[in-house]
Amino acid sequence: MCDLQQWISQYLLDCQYQKGLDPKTIKAYRIDLAQFLELAGQKNFKFTRNEIMAYISRLHQQYKPKTIRRKIASIKAFFGYLEYEGLVQENPFSKLRIKLAIPVILPRTIPLSVISSILASAYQQKETARSQIQRDGTLRDIAVLFATGVRVSELCTLGYDDVRLEEGEIKIYGKGAKERFVQIANPNVLGALHCYQEAYKDVITQSGAFFVNRLHKPLSDQSVRSIVNKYCRLAGVESHITPHMFRHSFATLLLEEGVDIRYIQRLLGHSSILTTQIYTHVAGKKQRDILLEKHPRNKIHFA
């Protein structure tokens, strides 16, 4: 067990410094592997097929299919690392073929009318702001989320040099340290960012982060959630809105406008187009709603 614990520590360091994985991904790996380590320490675990299947059976009793798949993938990747480093002769998970029926959960989106109300409340708040940070920072977060479709974590980790307003683009470091550029096509959003950058140039240069809070510290995920909640409340929006829903809405609305799905894939930073295709289901629902309302056959009635 001692060796296994040491190998896990080495593997997590490799994930951090060699693979450049997202801290949240590494945290999930750490939790999954610690859980597996606990089981391996309870008895003389031999990593045979039967013992591994028994472990997976235990997971089925506690978790949903999506979580089980992630945990298995974490352990499988770990043993792949051990095999590559010559620490084990064979990856006991490599030949396992486990099919899990994972329900497709469609992304939750925000109607454009609701987004408009939220942005309107932010503009109104800007006009009545008591401090400069409130005035210049009011629109930046929600506006950028919807204008670019970035993840909240990507927004919060934007460096000062990553935001290139003269070129109208931002450089994003996505999952797996993958780099991409996203353009800001809306002049109002660009204008708001220009005002913010000019007002806080010294602060954000010193901080290194482009988005800072009133204490001049890098913006956190929780801060963004609080900002979204605030403007939803001011706009009278009763439904639960999360920052990530702006990303879902960004992708779905572009699809509805006929934008090529491969371009949307690049904007979102998805490694596989299969991930992006989930939005076609949401856009398809919108198309059905339009047909129900607008199709001429529905206007023909028989006595």
Where are these regions (language model features)?
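Conserved catalytic core of the tyrosine transesterase superfamily
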Residues: 1-303
